[in-house]
Amino acid sequence: DGQIKLRGNRIELGEIENAARMVEGTENVCALFDAAKQEIVLFVETKGTLPPRQYNRELRKYIPAYMLPQRMVTMEKLPHNANDKIDRTALKKLLA
């Protein structure tokens, strides 16, 4: 589930999340693969310090271009499940 193949490249979604956490102002992140649209979507909870375009530029410092998310969704608070982990199931429903 954490590893995908996109345009001939193997991509670990966890690596994208780790890189996103290095961008200043990032609180929580979750990278998901939207199989229907064949794109990586990055859900980001930030302090609102960076506009999306600049956030993407910062992210490029930490990961190669082929790993960059095609879409970024900023949220005030990412949903959490009963175990206080990011609720990936709820986020996947937002992709539909």
Task: List each language-model region with its residue ranges.
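AMP-dependent adenylate-forming
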Residues: 1-96
